[in-house]
From Swiss-Prot:
Protein name (database record): Cytochrome b-c1 complex subunit 10
Family: Belongs to the UQCR11/QCR10 family.
One Pfam family, short name: UCR_6-4kD
Coiled-coil blocks: none
Record note on quaternary structure: Component of the ubiquinol-cytochrome c oxidoreductase (cytochrome b-c1 complex, complex III, CIII), a multisubunit enzyme composed of 11 subunits. The complex is composed of 3 respiratory subunits cytochrome b, cytochrome c1 and Rieske protein UQCRFS1, 2 core protein subunits UQCRC1/QCR1 and UQCRC2/QCR2, and 6 low-molecular weight protein subunits UQCRH/QCR6, UQCRB/QCR7, UQCRQ/QCR8, UQCR10/QCR9, UQCR11/QCR10 and subunit 9, the cleavage product of Rieske protein UQCRFS1.
Compartments where found: Mitochondrion inner membrane
Gene that specifies this protein: Uqcr11
Native source organism of the sequence: Mus musculus
Amino acid sequence: MLSRFLGPRYRELARNWIPTAGMWGTVGAVGLVWATDWRLILDWVPYINGKFKKDD
C-alpha cells in the first residue's frame, strides 16, 4: 500500500531508518518511565505488579 505512494528511493530510506526510529522510540519510552512515577507505569506489568502489593 505504501509502495504506491513512495518511489524506490524513499522506500529504501524508510527501510534504513526503521531500526533508528525504533531505538529512539525505545529511548523515549524509557525516558518517559524514568521521568514519571515509575510505579504508576510498572503497575501494568503483570510480573512486577505482583511484587509491590499494597498493605491495606
